[in-house]
C-alpha cells in the first residue's frame, strides 16, 4: 500500500460535513440582520450584537478553510486515482506567524501566478525602472528601492481584489492586505530589536501569540470579502472592539441567530477535529503518511470511522447541492 487517494477524498467530505452547512446558515442570518440592526442602533438604547459579529467572523474563517482545503483535497484524491499529481494549494495557513507567511500558505498557486505574471513584469518594466532611478536620485537609496516594490505590490493586491469580484468590498479587502504587509515590512527592524531585547523569538508562547494575532487580523480583513457594504463592515469591525458585551454569551443572543445548542456542539467538535489533525501535521508530519505505515486493520478501521462520521454528520439529501463550493467562484 503506497498511496491512498481515497483518504484525501474522505477527509474532504469530513471537512464539508454538517458543521460547514451550519456555519453557512449562521453567516447568512447574521448578515441578513446586520443592515437592519445598523439602523436600529441609532434609535434603540441597546448595544449591537457584537458577539454574533465576532462569531460570524470566526465561523466564516473556519467555513472558508474547510470549503477551500476540502475542495482541493478531493481534487488531489481524484487526480491521484488517475495517476496525476496535483500541487498542494493550502499548507496550514492558520498556523502562520504573519500575513506574508499566511499568503505563502493560502491559495499558493494563485499567489505564485500573481507574483510571476504581474509583480515581476511590472517591477522590471522600463517606466518602473525609470521611476526607481528618479526616486533614488532625488529621495535617496532607501526610498528609491521601496517605490517600485510598493507600487508593484499595490497593483498586485488591487488586481487580486478584482479577481475575487468586481466590487468595492473586494478591492478594499485586497488593499487592506497590501497595507498590512507593507507596514509589517517597515516595522521589521523594530520586531528584530524587540526579539533580541526580550529573547522571545522561537518560544512557544510567543509563537502562539503570533499565530493567534495573524489569524484574528486576517479574519477581520476577510469580513470585507464576506459582506459587500464597505461602510457597514467598517462599523461592524469597530463595534467588536468598542462595544463588546460579554453578557451576549449568556443571554441567548447566539441562539436567536438560527442555530441550536446541538448545532454549536457540532461546530465545536468539527473545529476540534480539524485543529487536531492540523496540529498533528505540524508536530508529527503528514497524517496520511503516518496512517499508511499502520497495519491494514488500523488503517481501514479509521477509514470506516470517517465514513460513519460522514453518514451521521454529513449534509446531504433533497435540496442539498454537493457541488456548491465557495471555492468554485474562484
What do the PLM-derived regions correspond to, one by one?
Residues 1-278, 282-329:
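Membrane-embedded transmembrane alpha-helical bundles that form the catalytic cores
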Amino acid at each position: 500500500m503506497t498511496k491512498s487517494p481515497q483518504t484525501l477524498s474522505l477527509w474532504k467530505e469530513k471537512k464539508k460535513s454538517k458543521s460547514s452547512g451550519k456555519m453557512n446558515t449562521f453567516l447568512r442570518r447574521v448578515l441578513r440582520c446586520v443592515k437592519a440592526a445598523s439602523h436600529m442602533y441609532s434609535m434603540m438604547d441597546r448595544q449591537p450584537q457584537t458577539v454574533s459579529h465576532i462569531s460570524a467572523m470566526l465561523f466564516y474563517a473556519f467555513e472558508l478553510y474547510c470549503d477551500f482545503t476540502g475542495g482541493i483535497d478531493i481534487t488531489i484524491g481524484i487526480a491521484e486515482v488517475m495517476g496525476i499529481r496535483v500541487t498542494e494549494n493550502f499548507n496550514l495557513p492558520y498556523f502562520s506567524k504573519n500575513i506574508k507567511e499566511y499568503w505563502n500558505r493560502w491559495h499558493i498557486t494563485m499567489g505564485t501566478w500573481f507574483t510571476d505574471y504581474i509583480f515581476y513584469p511590472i517591477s522590471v518594466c522600463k517606466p518602473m525602472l525609470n521611476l526607481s532611478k528618479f526616486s533614488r536620485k532625488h529621495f535617496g537609496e532607501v526610498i528609491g528601492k521601496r517605490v517600485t516594490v510598493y507600487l508593484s505590490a499595490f497593483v498586485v493586491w488591487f488586481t487580486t481584489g478584482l479577481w475575487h469580484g468586481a466590487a468595492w468590498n473586494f478591492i478594499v479587502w485586497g488593499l487592506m492586505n497590501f497595507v498590512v504587509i507593507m507596514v509589517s515590512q517597515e516595522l521589521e527592524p523594530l520586531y528584530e530589536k524587540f526579539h533580541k531585547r526580550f529573547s522571545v523569538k522561537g518560544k512557544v508562547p510567543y509563537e502562539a501569540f503570533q499565530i493567534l494575532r495573524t489569524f484574528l487580523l486576517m479574519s477581520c480583513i476577510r469580513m470585507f470579502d464576506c459582506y459587500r457594504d464597505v461602510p457597514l463592515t467598517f462599523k461592524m469591525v469597530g463595534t467588536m472592539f468598542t462595544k463588546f458585551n460579554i453578557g451576549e454569551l449568556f443571554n441567548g443572543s447566539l441562539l436567536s441567530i438560527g442555530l441550536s445548542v446541538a448545532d454549536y456542539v457540532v461546530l465545536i467538535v468539527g473545529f476540534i477535529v480539524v485543529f487536531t489533525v492540523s496540529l498533528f501535521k505540524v508536530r508529527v508530519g503528514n497524517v496520511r503518511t503516518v496512517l499508511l505505515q499502520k497495519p491494514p486493520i488500523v488503517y481501514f478501521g479509521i477509514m470506516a470511522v470517517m465514513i460513519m462520521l460522514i453518514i451521521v454528520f454529513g449534509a446531504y439529501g433533497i435540496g442539498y447541492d454537493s457541488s456548491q463550493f465557495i471555492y468554485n467562484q474562484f
